[in-house]
Amino acid sequence: MNDAMNYDRAAQSAKLRNAVFKGIVYFFLAIWALIVLFPFYWMILTSIKSYGAYNSEYIPQFITLKPTFENYVDAFTAVPLAKYFVNTLIFTVATTALMLVVIVPAAFAFARLNFRGKNLVFTLFLALMMIPTELVVITNYITITNLELRNTFWGLILPSVTSVFYIYLLKENFEQIPDELYYAAKVDGTSDLKYLLKVTLPICGPTVVTVTILKVIECWNSYVWPRLVTDDPNYFLVSNGIQEIRENGFGRENIPAMMAAVVVISVPLIVLFLVFRKKIMAGVARGGMKG
């Protein structure tokens, strides 16, 4: 009898400790969620404040009683934001597609094929990750200028069609596929390209999707490189448009209109993440496993 009572007390105590622990964890997670989401809230809040109301606030107000959508109109009328949006879409899709054409075969070659100097070449590839981005930007700018590709889509796209990090990530995932599958496919007369398309990519699909989404986000948020190689408005991206809206052509900073533009151009990325979030999580989880 006493043993049963002691067991019940121990079980209740364990449940209580578990509940308290979960409560503490959820409390800190809620605080962290508020910290992460607050910039988005502030961005949306600023976008619906009038220019006068925003500049008259000596103390920032966390709500607005007179919301306005005038800033969204200004964002599209002050600059040709719709055209910049299309340019960004072309740049993002083309760059991501070309990158996949380059990095997928490269990762497969390092993961599955045997050739002389493979380890040395891959080590040199990894060493490239140690080079600061600023140095690469300078070299790329000189190259693109010498090739007379400034103010062209090719000038925007070509420096971004490869990534050592993504090659490394895909290589590690491709190596997780059992060797027996590859040898069996070769016995059946399957070419390396067909094996890559029919076996490797379907198995590692979540990781490929993750790499694709990360590249899309990277291209969509590009700022430094487009500012360097484009001074023709016909090739401006949304990042250029936001900078133009900030000044608005009147020698003043129109922050509410700029925030409205940021909200508009952030929507595609948010939707993309929500649609593919399960694939992204699966790709990240697979990338963290070995063997």
Label the model's feature ranges.
Residues 3-8, 13-17, 21-291:
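A structural signal for multi-pass alpha-helical bundles of membrane permease subunits
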